[in-house]
Amino acid sequence: MLKGAITALITPFDHKGAIDERAFCDFVEWQITQGINGVSPVGTTGESATLSHEEHKQIIELCVEQVAKRVPVVAGAGSNSTSEAIELAQHAEKAGADAVLVVTPYYNRPNQSGLYKHFSSIAKAVSIPIIIYNIPGRSVIDMAVETMRDLYQNFNNIIGVKDATSRIERVSEQGEKCGKDFVQLSGDDCTALGFNAHGGVGCISVSSNVAPKLCAELQAACFHGDYKTARELNDRLMPLNRAVFIEPSPAGIKYAAAKLGLCGETVRSPIVPLTESTKKIIDEALSHAGLLKA
């Protein structure tokens, strides 16, 4: 089962904006040595929206090869076109990914019947597990719990959700409708602790790009019922969780990674580099977490 801290991986670029393959592979290796529980390439944080399909596939292949089955690879495979989502999911399966993360279609705003058709079509096209990515703030639609339940009950390879609704009560609602084996992962670092307390089993995390050890320790503390330690770790991470989203993501987390010497901070337009004031806040948050010496 997918659980724990799963990093929503950034995609390092060189100063010209091309994929930095060496930096990416080194970054993935560092994540594993730090104790991360899984990695998720080419999602929102990986700037999938500004990657070509060829680049998207390239990153998945690099990630699968570097990970070499040591932790699960949950590959992004979303699109607002069902046929494109199927193509990306099939490629991820062929490349050796352990699961795919499929976002609810954005911009075209399908109704619940359209959402069911979209995900059922993908489920029929691949055999690997599918995680529904429900993020109304970006896709402008919210998959109803009943739609999620129907998909889960009717397709064996639809196994759970990355919930980025920031509505903590959804964990209980989804658990009640879908059952205890439905995999619920938080999509928001700020709610990760409470999410687990309500029945979640982990977080697909942005902050773990720079704090994989702390995020994995927080998740482990939750699993062992040690919420005192989990709260202490959460308090260390919370300023960072907030700071990296002051300006449009992933500029914030890429700056933080660059500050720690993990990769460059280049982002692709229309995302732009951070202002100096936000950089200062992130520096302070990194120091608060114990990741950056004052």
UniProtKB/Swiss-Prot annotation:
Instruction: Check the record and name the PROSITE patterns matching this protein.
Output: DHDPS_2
Q: Give a Pfam family name.
A: DHDPS
> Per the record, where is site Part of a proton relay during catalysis?
44, 107
**Where in the sequence is the signal peptide annotated?**
none
The UniProt keyword set, sorted, is: Amino-acid biosynthesis, Cytoplasm, Diaminopimelate biosynthesis, Lyase, Lysine biosynthesis, Schiff base
Instruction: State whether it acts alone or in a complex, and with which partners, per the record.
Output: Homotetramer; dimer of dimers.
Record protein name field: 4-hydroxy-tetrahydrodipicolinate synthase
Q: Which organism is it from?
A: Bartonella tribocorum (strain CIP 105476 / IBS 506)
Query: What is the organism lineage in this UniProt record?
Result: Bacteria, Pseudomonadati, Pseudomonadota, Alphaproteobacteria, Hyphomicrobiales
What is the gene name? dapA
